Amino acid sequence: MIKKAFCMQVYPDQHAEYQRRHEKLWPEMRQMLKEHGAIKYQIFLNPETSTLFGYLEIEDEARWEQIALTPINQKWWNYMEDIMETNPDCSPMTAELKKVFEL
């Protein structure tokens, strides 16, 4: 199992909307994540900085990277573009985090 952590930024006035959209995650998006090896996927929000912290457990890095090519993921990125910082391809701007401790 591979553990990954990363940060993203949601716009300060969009915290509730970000949470609402994830509470209503499309079933086909949920299925696609699992099919691409997501074992556990959690996102936390620091409301003071609007920083999102993502934690992910996956089975295989190469398989996971293929999600960017799926039509449902492209649709999700477009859906989320108006409420968070994104790249020109609408993917969320992310900063990978380095694990420095585990108990």
UniProtKB/Swiss-Prot annotation:
Entry keyword annotation includes Hydrolase: no
Catalytic residues, chain numbering: 22 (proton donor)
Domain of life: Bacteria
Substrates-to-products reaction catalysed: alpha-L-rhamnose = beta-L-rhamnose
Pathway the protein takes part in: Carbohydrate metabolism; L-rhamnose metabolism
InterPro entries named among the record's database cross-references: Dimeric_a/b-barrel, L-rhamnose_mutarotase, Rham/fucose_mutarotase
Keyword Phosphoprotein found: no
SUPFAM superfamilies the record matches: Dimeric alpha+beta barrel (SSF54909)
Keywords tagged on the record: Carbohydrate metabolism, Cytoplasm, Isomerase, Rhamnose metabolism
Membership in a protein family: Belongs to the rhamnose mutarotase family.
Function: Involved in the anomeric conversion of L-rhamnose.
HAMAP family: L_rham_rotase
Quaternary organization: Homodimer.
Protein's name according to its UniProt entry: L-rhamnose mutarotase
Natural source organism: Enterococcus faecalis (strain ATCC 700802 / V583)
Taxonomic lineage from the root: Bacteria, Bacillati, Bacillota, Bacilli, Lactobacillales
